[in-house]
C-alpha cells in the first residue's frame, strides 16, 4: 500500500429536516415519534407523549470526512451535531491530521486519552466514533477491500436480520428473522399500563403465529421490579428477550434482573454503553445474555472489535444496536455476531428504507431477511453529493481560534 498521510478532518451537520444518523429527527408523522413509547422521561407527565418532546433529537447527525494527501476520502458518522463537530475540529483533529491512517490504534488511543477530562462516555466518544469510522473507510479504499476483509474476512455469506418495528406482522411477511417492538408503557403508568403492554404483545403474537421470534425494547424506562413483573407476564407469548430495561449505569440492577429472568427470557443491553471498559463491567457482573454496542457511538470500529473479541471469550453473543452498514461489516467478520438489527424507518413501518435516509448512496438493505455485503472497498457506501451539509466550524484555526 502506498505511503499516505491524513491531510484534513472535516465535520458536518445536516441541513434542517434531514435525518441522517439521528433516526428520531423525523418530519411529519412517524411511528417512532408518534406512538407512546416508554423512555427515561416517561416518569414526567409533560414528556410522556413523545420522545421528541424532551429533545432526544436536539443534537442530530455528525458526518465526518477524513481526506488523505492522495485525495482519498473516507466517511463516518454518529450523533452529536454541532457540539460533536466542535470537539472534532478543535480538539481531535490534532491527533489525526498528519498521521498515517494505518496507525488507527495510535490515533484512537490519543483521541481517547485526550478527551478523558471531559469525555469517557457520551458525546466525546460519539465524536471519536465518527472519526474512527472515516479512517477505516480510508483504509479499505486504499487497499481496495471491504472493511470486513481488513478484520480477517467474512465468517458468513449473508447476515440474518430481525426488524425493529411497530408492525411485526409485516416484518414476518417480509422474511425477517423475528421482530422487536417498543414497550409502550412504564412504571408510572401503573397496572393499567402493564395490562396494555401485555395486550400489545398478545396482539403481536396472534399476528405472527407461534414460531416467529418476538423481542421487547424498553429503552431505559423500567425499574427492576417492574421489568421482572412484565417479563414474567409476557412469558406466555414466548418473549425471546427484553432489552435495555434500566438506565445503563445500573449494573447491579441488570445483574439482579438477569438472575431473576433466567429460564424466562434473555436480558440484553449495551446500546447506551461506551467503550470496552463499560462492557467489561457488563460482562464481569453478569448483567446480560446478549451485548448490544452501537458501533457509531461506542468508539467506532476500533473499539467495537475489542468489545466483540472480549465477549467471545465469555461465549456471549454480540448483536449490535442499529441497522448500520458500519456494524454489518463488524458482524460479517466475527463468529459471535449471529444476527443483525434492522430499523424499519418508513413512517408507517410498511416499507424498507435506508436507515440513514438520503445521506448515503448504496446503503445495503435486507432482502428476504438477510443482508449481503459486496466486495466494494471501504464501507461500500458513498456520500450523497446532492445533500446539503453544513460545516459549522470550517473557519476554526487548529490552534483553537475561530477567525
Residue map of PLM features:
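Active-site-flanking structural segment that lines cofactor/substrate pockets
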Residues: 39-69
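Glycine-rich, aromatic-flanked loop segments that form ligand/cofactor-binding clefts
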Residues: 123-126, 132-168
Amino acid at each position: 500500500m502506498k505511503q499516505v498521510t491524513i491531510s484534513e478532518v472535516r465535520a458536518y451537520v445536516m441541513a434542517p429536516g434531514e435525518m441522517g444518523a439521528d433516526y428520531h429527527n423525523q418530519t411529519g408523522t412517524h411511528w417512532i415519534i408518534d406512538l407512546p413509547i416508554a423512555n427515561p422521561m416517561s416518569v414526567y407527565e409533560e414528556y410522556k407523549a413523545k420522545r421528541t418532546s424532551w429533545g432526544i433529537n436536539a443534537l442530530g447527525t455528525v458526518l465526518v470526512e477524513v481526506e488523505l494527501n492522495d485525495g482519498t476520502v473516507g466517511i463516518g458518522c454518529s450523533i452529536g451535531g454541532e457540539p460533536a463537530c466542535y470537539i472534532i475540529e478543535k480538539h481531535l483533529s490534532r491527533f489525526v491530521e498528519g498521521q498515517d491512517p494505518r496507525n488507527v490504534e495510535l490515533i484512537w488511543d490519543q483521541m481517547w486519552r485526550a478527551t478523558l477530562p471531559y469525555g469517557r462516555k457520551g458525546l466525546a466518544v460519539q465524536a471519536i466514533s465518527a472519526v474512527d469510522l472515516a479512517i477505516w473507510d480510508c483504509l479499505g479504499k486504499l487497499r481496495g477491500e471491504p472493511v470486513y476483509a481488513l478484520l480477517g474476512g467474512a465468517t458468513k455469506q449473508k447476515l440474518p436480520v430481525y426488524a425493529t418495528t411497530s408492525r411485526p406482522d409485516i416484518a414476518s411477511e417480509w422474511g425477517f428473522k423475528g421482530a422487536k417492538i417498543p414497550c409502550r408503557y412504564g412504571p408510572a403508568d401503573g397496572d393499567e399500563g402493564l395490562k396494555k403492554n401485555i395486550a400489545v404483545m398478545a396482539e403481536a403474537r396472534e399476528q405472527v403465529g407461534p414460531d416467529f421470534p418476538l423481542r421487547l425494547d424498553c429503552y431505559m424506562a423500567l425499574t427492576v421490579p417492574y421489568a421482572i413483573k412484565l417479563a414474567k407476564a409476557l412469558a406466555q407469548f414466548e418473549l425471546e428477550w427484553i432489552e435495555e430495561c434500566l438506565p445503563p449505569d445500573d449494573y447491579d440492577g441488570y445483574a439482579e434482573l438477569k438472575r431473576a429472568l433466567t429460564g424466562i427470557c434473555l436480558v440484553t443491553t449495551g446500546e447506551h454503553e461506551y467503550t470496552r471498559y463499560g462492557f467489561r463491567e457488563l460482562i464481569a457482573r453478569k448483567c446480560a445474555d446478549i451485548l448490544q454496542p452501537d458501533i457509531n457511538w461506542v468508539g467506532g470500529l476500533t473499539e467495537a472489535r475489542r468489545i466483540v473479541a472480549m465477549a467471545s471469550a465469555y461465549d456471549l453473543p454480540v448483536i449490535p444496536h442499529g441497522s448500520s452498514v458500519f456494524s454489518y461489516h463488524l458482524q460479517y467478520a466475527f463468529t459471535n455476531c449471529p444476527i443483525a438489527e434492522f430499523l424499519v424507518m418508513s413512517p408507517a413501518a410498511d416499507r424498507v428504507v435506508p436507515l440513514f435516509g438520503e445521506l448515503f448512496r448504496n446503503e445495503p438493505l435486507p432482502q428476504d431477511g438477510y443482508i449481503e455485503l459486496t466486495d466494494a472497498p471501504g464501507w461500500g457506501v458513498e456520500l450523497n453529493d446532492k445533500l446539503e451539509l453544513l460545516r459549522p466550524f470550517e473557519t476554526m484555526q487548529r490552534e483553537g481560534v475561530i477567525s
